[in-house]
């Protein structure tokens, strides 16, 4: 991984390890996020009809979550947080993927009802500072990124590490990426 090698070249000690309970955070997120979306859309005059299909899918999934399941997820989140906090007493940062695959083409079918696991869920659920950074493109020109995660209240460290990697990899060429992505859409025109 280029990001890990960059930190290693700068003198950081880099070693593979996984924070405890990350897989459980996705399960907790699969309860808490839909329940939250459901609460938000119930307060909207149109019930969230104008929202992005993926948010509507989360809201629909939230309708079947019981108060008991919600409370159980909140309790488990607290327990997992204690384990992850102990992990960050041994490590300053985690470098990990943002998503389990590279970016999807705009022409790939989007399923509004498929709830994808995200490598960001554990950060969201445990209140950890994280930053997603551009690190290059695939051979097809699709953007690739990584995520830097710090322990609770380590926001400044995450921002500093992000700055270091941005200096090493450069900023994302947004105009060029937008043209590439636009031209990948059937019938799309590059501008």
Predicted ranges, named:
Residues 31-35, 113, 149-150:
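Short, hinge-like loop/turn segments at secondary-structure boundaries
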């Amino acid at each position: 991984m280029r990001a890990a090698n960059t930190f290693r070249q700068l003198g950081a000690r880099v070693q593979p390890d996984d924070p405890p309970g990350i897989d459980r955070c996705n399960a907790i997120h699969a309860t808490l996020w839909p329940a939250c979306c459901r609460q938000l859309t119930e307060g909207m005059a149109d019930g969230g009809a104008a929202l992005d299909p993926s948010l509507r899918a989360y809201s629909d999934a939230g309708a079947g979550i019981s108060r008991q399941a919600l409370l159980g997820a909140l309790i488990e989140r607290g327990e997992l947080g204690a384990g992850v906090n102990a992990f960050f007493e041994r490590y300053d940062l985690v470098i990990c993927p943002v998503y389990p695959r590279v970016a999807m083409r705009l022409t790939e079918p989007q399923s509004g009802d498929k709830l994808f696991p995200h490598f960001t869920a554990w950060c969201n659920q445990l209140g950890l500072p994280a930053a997603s950074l551009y690190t290059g493109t695939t051979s097809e020109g699709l953007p690739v990124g990584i995520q830097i995660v710090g322990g609770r209240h380590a926001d400044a460290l995450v921002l500093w590490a992000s700055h270091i990697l941005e200096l090493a990899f450069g900023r994302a060429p947004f105009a060029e990426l937008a043209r590439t992505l636009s031209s990948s859409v059937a019938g799309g025109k590059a501008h």
